[in-house]
Amino acid sequence: MELKLLNENGQEGAVVNASDVVFGRDYNEALIHQIVVAYQANARQGNRAQKDREQVKHTTKKPWRQKGTGRARAGMSSSPLWRGGGRIFPNSPEENFSHKVNKKMHRAGLCSIFSQLAREGRLSVVEDIVLEAPKTKLLADKFKAMGLDSVLIITDTVDENLYLASRNLPHVAVVEPRYADPLSLIYFKKVLVTKAAVAQIEELLS
């Protein structure tokens, strides 16, 4: 598989030969959907809590007598049928939202994403991205010259200047290959990979 090499002006020049195992896979929509859903589910913290009928503070007195009033029978005001009553199946912080995905499936899904990005022209290779100082303006000007606005940068090692400069840009992220997740790969319009990171990605996913 040949990946396009971009220069600092965003123009395509030479090509980089990459592994077909990683960057030449067929598109597998079902598998990609599965690993994205699992990634989102595993990110959930379980920070919602509701009360069941045992936890709500209500009297246990019967609201009215069983027969003779013409109204529906009622046992206590904490009933889930009543306003202010407890929930039948309340949300709990102890809920387990995790989804398990086998390692082979996860790797195959990432390969399918990388391959589709390459086919769509959303994946490009750069020699390296170097900044003289941790200034957001320097990085913003560089991306403006390349015609980019939503970028995921995958580098072999995260340079401190690059990381600090990217933090204040709303649609830019910098990660190492081992931290590239399926959701970010799909979300960003463009994925820039340094030449050294291509080899690391092939090693991780082959």
UniProtKB/Swiss-Prot annotation:
The UniProt entry's GO biological process terms, in alphabetical order, are:
translation
Q: GO molecular-function annotation terms?
A: rRNA binding; structural constituent of ribosome
Q: What SUPFAM superfamilies does the record point to? A: Ribosomal protein L4 (SSF52166)
Instruction: Tell me the keywords, alphabetical order.
Output: Ribonucleoprotein, Ribosomal protein, RNA-binding, rRNA-binding
Q: Where is this region: Disordered?
A: 46-78
Q: Which InterPro entries match?
A: Ribosomal_uL4 (IPR002136), Ribosomal_uL4-like (IPR013005), Ribosomal_uL4_dom_sf (IPR023574)
> What's in the GO CC field?
ribonucleoprotein complex; ribosome
* Biased segments, Basic residues type: 58-70
Q: What are the coiled-coil residue ranges?
A: none
Function, in words? One of the primary rRNA binding proteins, this protein initially binds near the 5'-end of the 23S rRNA. It is important during the early stages of 50S assembly. It makes multiple contacts with different domains of the 23S rRNA in the assembled 50S subunit and ribosome. Forms part of the polypeptide exit tunnel.
Q: Which family does it belong to?
A: Belongs to the universal ribosomal protein uL4 family.
Which NCBIfam families has this protein been placed in?
rplD_bact
- What is the annotated quaternary arrangement, including any partners? Part of the 50S ribosomal subunit.
Q: What is this protein called?
A: Large ribosomal subunit protein uL4
Q: Which organism is it from?
A: Burkholderia multivorans (strain ATCC 17616 / 249)
Q: What is the lineage of its organism?
A: Bacteria, Pseudomonadati, Pseudomonadota, Betaproteobacteria, Burkholderiales
